């Protein structure tokens, strides 16, 4: 399945719009505590552990988006937006959400 942040796919013609599709993934409080506890793996101001967890959450959200688009009969998702949001100041959960428009292209 083609995934893109752009509103069109160059060289392809959109023949059907299925509508908005989304996917979400939430990192729980324990994961974030573990990540922040592992801050000592900082290299050049970046935490490899934290980045890996964020990447994994983004991959889960994108897989869910693809599954939802596939169920509709789409073969591409255009205009994808990826957002990161902290849920609750006390429990520190992090949500990765992705959304886009499911389409069929030829």
UniProtKB/Swiss-Prot annotation:
Lineage start: Bacteria, Pseudomonadati, Pseudomonadota, Betaproteobacteria, Nitrosomonadales
InterPro entries: UPF0145_dom_sf (IPR035439), UPF0145_YbjQ-like (IPR002765)
PANTHER family: UPF0145 PROTEIN YBJQ (PTHR34068:SF1)
Family, per entry: Belongs to the UPF0145 family.
Protein name (record): UPF0145 protein NE1032
Domain of life per record: Bacteria
SUPFAM superfamilies: YbjQ-like (SSF117782)
HAMAP family found in the cross-reference section: UPF0145
């Amino acid at each position: 399945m083609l995934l893109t942040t752009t509103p069109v796919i160059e060289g392809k013609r959109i023949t059907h719009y299925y509508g908005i599709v989304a996917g979400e993934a939430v990192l729980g409080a324990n994961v974030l505590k573990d990540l922040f506890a592992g801050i000592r793996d900082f290299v050049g101001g970046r935490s490899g552990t934290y980045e890996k967890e964020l990447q994994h959450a983004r991959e889960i959200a994108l897989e869910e988006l693809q599954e939802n688009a596939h169920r509709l009969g789409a073969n591409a998702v255009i205009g994808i937006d990826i957002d990161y949001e902290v849920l609750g100041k006390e429990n520190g959960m992090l949500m990765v959400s992705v959304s886009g428009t499911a389409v069929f292209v030829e």
